[in-house]
């Protein structure tokens, strides 16, 4: 009978059926020579053997001899002797190999070459030699891909101790001392034998064979793996996939290598892990077995566990960890390495529980709580893995990780935001050129205390993640065990499965933290004050005294702070750093683009007096250089001078929520940056999940919370188990010592606001789509709703979520401009056709009125000068255009309204109200007749109807006046009339698709033309293609603007921000004159010298994409914000608004959010309310199960399609 394909024990068969044919069993008589030989060998080898000892006692002594190379039954007198025996057991035991006994047992002649090979593989053990021979593993022992069913001697040999590397996923190595570049050998492993007894436990195994005399009381059995399947396999794309069907079959065999039975699944699940990962070896003794054995009978075994030396040697994870990224879009799916760690830690916890091994450093209650938490976290991970395997990852929509509600976030921040206003203040040094507010000085004091809190005199204590265990002194039979001098304890990290013989000391706690002040409170300035206040100054030395650097390895950079920020903020950091520093007190290096061609190892070394004080770089550069750093082969004799070759004095991550995904390449790169002090700047430490905070804690290397297994045990698992209050309480404990957070809504004890900011007004303006836009919107909406209804009926709503979401995107784009939903190639062809038509016609989409008057007047003058008869049409055209210019066109010939309302002009230059003219043409077309001019009866083409657009006169501001004109010394100051306002004729229905305006663009222009002089505005949109359409309309309206989006290089972004944030500066005389001529209210220019008043005026509008400019930027030069389209979460929009309404803003801020009436955008506002918790759900009752979250998402979709 074959049981290889089954993991579970078969059901008991009924006894009255005919028994299976009995296998030919080895009779006691046939076995006796081997047993006698083995027994005699054991008796001869073991001086402590008693003549009346039981077989179990004999086996116990054999195991001790086996585990210590045959020479450790008596404690050695010198450590050196024990070290030699542990390292070379084969050398001492090969001479004891009984060849005659081996040949007699196997029953056939064996060649000398084969015999020699088997002796080497078995380390001279007759028992192992028999197993090796019968299972055939000696034939392919050298093949790396062979499947082993028994433990070979090559696995038992203690390999050479490797340097102590600690996985960064745990970040809690037993001997880490803060210097990642220093590696020390595991010295105690040289004293440790290849195997050492740990304990014993009983198990009820089951038989897989039938027979008589197969096994009896006292017989020795070998515990082996039936076969071992890899935890990860390569998929079609070449990427590693986690094998969710882990094989746990564990068999036991007799001394002849025959399989007798298997361990029960509940035991095999963790025993197989310990065998596969070479942590333990098990030897079994039969306690009870039926004389007549049948399949599925219960066999009682006593298993003795021996810890292998390999278990104490660190495991190196693969370098290319990014290949293990799961195919799902969510970050919670575990990788192959994480599954190995999970199985290892669970196996060790179960083993220690079975053998009754207790930690010496913890009481029973704490031990119990830790065990329960570990097993619960592991069980949740296992259930998640099985669920993903069952679904095949085809529908990841239901697997979205639980998110935090707004009130839960408020609860998390409650302790962090309980700011002590009586905290002492710290004054920055004289090299710092700015004046700090009180709360900023308090922040400086807090940051200095975090960085300088070394506590070097404290006593050494064990690492909080590790537990200490004593090696047992007696075995299960109360016999004395060998004592290894100097190794009385071993240490276990149950959260990572690591083991160590060296004492894992508690490392220096985090010398940094999280500065989480709300956006706009000046985190950048606070951090710059810290850079000035706590830094090492390079010594003044000549070039000849420079220290020679090694060609490889990491070099310390004691004078340099590294700042990692989004590309858009690099220029702002550079400007703020120089602005906040006295001349010559700060050297800033921009490490980006072509400026990366420097060797940081040499530039930032301790011997370089010219080392930069601050290096600015982007997250993209860090990720790119980390890839190069990982590609270097281990032991490379050369190290490139990049960011990972330097141990910085301080590392600062700005907008650090970028690394919230712990498995992203950017996050992994940032984890590997080396620095003494580590800081995180973010206004949102937790975006929407608890694991967002873990990534920051891991970067800061806050122990023990930077261990993900520990985090899952005490935070993630309780939260997912609906113990939300407990999980939040633990997170508050983590946050309290790490985070400093103040908000703009805080008030001082005197009742004053923490930061006095001007008033902010947010107004929603409903926009009505024009008829053509509404038709397009209704068409797309109908298709989207049909798709939604059909999927609801079929029950496949979430499987088609991406399709529905794409149609929602089209609806949102239609609200902005219909052209955004059209095929780009077709639009480009229409643009070319419109341009060609403009070239062939005298009528353009947009014509300047003054240029038309000049052209027709010149034609009439030329005719008069040449004595030709004048063209009456030319004279009429010039006259009609002048009437439009002087606004004296009279009453409307259609409605008799005087003056005309929004005058429009036909191609024959007759004027009427725009609304009247459009209705007149539509009336003619409804009657089925060709529209004709209401005045001259000429044919009317709807494409050739022009509206009159009047632009405001150039604003008269102090910057446009010279001091001489103000003082009256210029004789032309009062005689020069102001330039006339610009007027243009613009097609109502342009030929060019991009020239068409939309309801939102029209509403935006209506606001911008009413903006007071000297006031700047910021226009946000998440669609850069929409910004492409807004720009030309601003140009036509005579509004100067600049643009910033994600496609621009860093230097171009810096130039745009410099132009937009540039303020005009005036003299005192100019200010007095401005006040006397009703200067715009709220204008607060800075008095400067007269020569600065001649600088050209800066743009008044900044077009910016929501993603590129939503965070970090300082846009206080503006006071008007226009949000062209809503986002799913208002928090994203609030971040963008806070770029303007922040510290440094002197004017009231007006925010207008354009929302299309009766559209998807109005329903998005209701979704925002749900996400903000306004809908009434407290959320403290837990996130619910998957079915509840599924219903919630379906309800949101229903809300969008009401």
Curated annotation (Swiss-Prot):
Residues involved in ATP binding: 517-524
Ranges of Basic and acidic residues composition bias in the record: 1-10
Annotated SMART domains: DEXDc, HELICc, HIRAN, RING
EC number of the protein: 3.6.4.-
CDD domains xref list: DEXDc_SHPRH-like, SF2_C_SNF
EC class (word): hydrolase
Low complexity composition bias: residue spans: 1084-1097
Localization annotation: Cytoplasm; Nucleus
Keywords attached to this entry: ATP-binding, Cytoplasm, DNA damage, DNA repair, DNA-binding, Helicase, Hydrolase, Metal-binding, Nucleotide-binding, Nucleus, Zinc, Zinc-finger
UniProt xrefs under InterPro entries: Helicase_ATP-bd, Helicase_C-like, HIRAN, P-loop_NTPase, SNF2-like_sf, SNF2/RAD54-like_C, SNF2_N, SNF2_RAD54_helicase_TF
Cellular component, GO, one term: cytoplasm
UniProt entry tagged with the keyword Cell cycle: no
Compositional bias ranges of the Polar residues kind: 37-90, 143-152, 952-967, 1074-1083
GO molecular function, one term: ATP-dependent activity, acting on DNA
Main localization, broad class: cytoplasm
Annotated family: Belongs to the SNF2/RAD54 helicase family.
PANTHER family: DNA REPAIR PROTEIN RAD5, TRANSCRIPTION TERMINATION FACTOR 2-RELATED
Protein name: DNA repair protein rad5
Organism: Emericella nidulans (strain FGSC A4 / ATCC 38163 / CBS 112.46 / NRRL 194 / M139) (Aspergillus nidulans)
Lineage, broadest ranks: Eukaryota, Fungi, Dikarya, Ascomycota, Pezizomycotina
């Amino acid at each position: 009978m074959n049981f290889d394909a089954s993991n579970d024990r078969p059901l008991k068969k009924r006894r009255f059926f005919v028994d299976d044919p009995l296998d030919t069993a080895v009779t006691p008589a046939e076995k006796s020579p081997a047993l006698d030989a083995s027994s005699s060998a054991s008796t001869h080898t073991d001086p402590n053997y008693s003549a009346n000892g039981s077989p179990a006692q004999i086996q116990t002594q054999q195991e001790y001899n086996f585990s210590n190379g045959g020479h450790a039954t008596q404690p050695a007198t010198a450590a050196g002797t024990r070290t030699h025996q542990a390292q070379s057991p084969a050398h001492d035991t090969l001479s004891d190999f009984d060849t005659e006994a081996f040949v007699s047992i196997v029953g056939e002649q064996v060649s000398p070459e084969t015999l020699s090979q088997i002796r080497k593989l078995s380390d001279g053990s007759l028992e192992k030699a028999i197993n090796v021979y019968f299972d055939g593993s000696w034939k392919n022992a050298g093949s790396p891909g062979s499947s082993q069913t028994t433990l070979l001697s090559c696995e038992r040999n203690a390999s050479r101790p490797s340097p102590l590397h600690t996985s960064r996923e745990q970040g809690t190595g037993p001997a880490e001392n803060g210097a990642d570049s220093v590696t020390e050998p595991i010295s105690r492993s040289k004293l440790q034998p290849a195997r050492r007894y740990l304990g014993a436990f009983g198990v009820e195994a089951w038989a897989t064979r039938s027979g008589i005399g197969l096994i009896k009381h006292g017989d020795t059995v070998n515990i082996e793996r039936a076969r071992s399947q890899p935890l990860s396999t390569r998929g079609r794309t070449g990427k590693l996939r986690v094998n969710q069907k882990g094989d746990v079959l564990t068999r036991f065999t007799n001394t002849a290598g025959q399989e007798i039975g298997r361990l029960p699944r509940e035991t095999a699940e963790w025993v197989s892990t310990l065998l596969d990962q070479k942590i333990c070896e098990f030897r079994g003794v039969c306690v009870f077995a039926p004389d007549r054995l049948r399949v599925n009978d219960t066999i009682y075994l006593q298993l003795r566990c021996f810890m292998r030396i390999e278990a104490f040697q660190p495991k190196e994870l693969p370098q290319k960890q990014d290949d293990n990224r799961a195919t799902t879009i969510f970050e919670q799916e575990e990788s192959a390495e994480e599954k190995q760690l999970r199985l290892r830690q669970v196996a060790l916890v179960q083993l220690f529980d079975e053998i009754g091994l207790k930690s010496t450093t913890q009481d029973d209650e704490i031990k119990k709580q830790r065990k329960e938490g570990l097993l619960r976290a592991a069980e949740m991970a296992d259930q998640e893995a099985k669920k993903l395997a069952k679904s095949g990852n085809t529908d990841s929509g239901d697997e979205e990780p639980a998110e935090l509600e707004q009130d839960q976030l408020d609860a998390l921040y409650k302790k962090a935001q309980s700011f002590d206003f009586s905290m002492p203040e710290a004054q920055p040094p004289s090299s710092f050129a700015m004046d700090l507010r009180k709360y900023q000085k308090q922040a400086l004091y807090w940051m200095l205390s975090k960085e300088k809190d070394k506590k070097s005199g404290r006593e050494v204590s064990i690492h909080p993640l590790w537990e200490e265990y004593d090696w047992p002194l007696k075995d299960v039979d109360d016999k004395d065990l060998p004592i290894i001098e100097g190794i009385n304890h071993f240490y276990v990290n149950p959260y990572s499965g690591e083991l160590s013989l060296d004492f894992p000391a508690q490392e220096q706690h985090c010398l940094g933290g999280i500065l989480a002040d709300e956006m706009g409170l000046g985190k950048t300035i606070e951090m710059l004050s810290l850079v000035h206040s706590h830094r090492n100054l390079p010594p003044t030395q000549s070039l000849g005294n420079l220290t020679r650097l090694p060609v490889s390895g990491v070099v310390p950079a004691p004078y340099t702070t590294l700042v990692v920020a989004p590309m858009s903020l690099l220029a702002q950091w550079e400007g703020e750093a120089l602005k906040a520093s006295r001349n010559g007190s700060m050297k800033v290096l921009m490490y980006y683009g072509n400026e990366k061609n420097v060797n940081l190892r040499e530039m930032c070394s301790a011997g370089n007096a010219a080392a930069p004080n601050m290096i600015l770089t982007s997250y993209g550069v860090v990720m790119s250089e980390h890839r190069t750093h990982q590609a270097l082969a281990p032991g490379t004799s050369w190290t490139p001078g990049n960011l990972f070759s330097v141990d910085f004095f301080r590392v600062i991550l700005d907008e650090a929520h970028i690394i919230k995904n712990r498995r992203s390449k950017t996050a992994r790169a940032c984890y590997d940056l080396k620095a003494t002090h580590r800081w995180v700047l973010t206004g949102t430490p937790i975006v929407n999940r608890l694991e967002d905070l873990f990534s920051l804690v891991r970067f800061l290397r806050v122990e023990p919370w930077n261990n993900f297994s520990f985090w899952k045990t005490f935070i993630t698992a309780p939260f997912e188990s609906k113990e939300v209050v407990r999980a939040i309480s633990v997170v508050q404990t983590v946050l309290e010592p790490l985070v400093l957070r103040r908000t703009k809504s805080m008030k001082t004890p005197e009742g004053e606001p923490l930061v006095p900011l001007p008033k902010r007004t947010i107004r929603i303006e409903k926009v009505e789509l024009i008829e053509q836009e509404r038709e397009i919107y209704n068409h797309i909406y109908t298709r989207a709703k049909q798709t939604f209804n059909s999927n609801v009926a079929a029950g496949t709503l979430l499987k088609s979520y991406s399709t529905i979401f794409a149609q929602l995107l089209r609806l949102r784009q239609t609200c902005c401009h219909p052209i955004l939903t059209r095929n780009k190639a077709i639009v480009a062809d229409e643009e070319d056709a419109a341009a060609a038509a403009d070239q062939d016609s005298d009528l353009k989409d947009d014509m300047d009125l003054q240029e038309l008057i000049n052209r027709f007047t010149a034609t009439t003058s030329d005719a008069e000068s040449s004595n030709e008869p004048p063209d009456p049409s030319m004279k009429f055209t010039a006259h009609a255009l002048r009437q439009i210019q002087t606004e004296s066109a009279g009453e409307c010939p259609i409605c008799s309204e005087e003056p005309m309302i929004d005058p429009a002009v036909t191609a024959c230059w007759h004027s009427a109200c725009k609304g009247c003219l459009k209705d007149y043409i539509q009336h003619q077309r409804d009657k089925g007749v060709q529209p004709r001019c209401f005045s001259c009866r000429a044919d009317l083409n709807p494409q050739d109807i022009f509206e009159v657009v009047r632009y405001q006169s150039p604003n008269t501001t102090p910057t446009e006046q010279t001091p001489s004109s103000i003082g009256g010394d210029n004789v032309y100051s009062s005689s020069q009339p102001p330039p006339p306002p610009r007027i243009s004729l613009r097609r109502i229905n342009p030929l060019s698709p991009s020239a068409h305006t939309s309801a939102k663009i029209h509403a935006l222009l209506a606001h911008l033309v009413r903006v007071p002089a000297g006031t700047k505005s910021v226009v946000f949109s998440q669609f850069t293609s929409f910004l492409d359409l807004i720009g030309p309309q601003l140009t036509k309206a005579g509004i100067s603007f600049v643009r910033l989006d994600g496609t621009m290089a860093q230097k171009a972004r810096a130039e745009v921000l410099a132009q937009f944030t540039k303020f005009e500066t005036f003299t005192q005389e100019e200010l007095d004159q401005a006040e006397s001529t009703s200067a715009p209210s709220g204008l607060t220019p800075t008095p400067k010298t007269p020569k600065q008043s001649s600088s050209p005026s800066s743009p008044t509008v900044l077009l910016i994409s929501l993603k590129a400019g939503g965070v970090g930027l300082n846009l206080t030069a503006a006071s008007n914000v226009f949000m062209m389209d809503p986002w799913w979460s208002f928090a994203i929009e609030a971040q963008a608004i806070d770029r303007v309404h922040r510290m440094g803003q002197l004017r009231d801020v007006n925010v207008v959010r354009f929302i299309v009436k009766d559209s998807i955008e109005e329903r998005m506002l209701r979704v925002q309310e749900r996400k903000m918790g306004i809908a009434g759900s407290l959320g403290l009752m837990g996130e619910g199960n998957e079915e509840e979250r599924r219903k919630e998402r379906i309800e949101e979709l229903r809300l969008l399609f009401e």
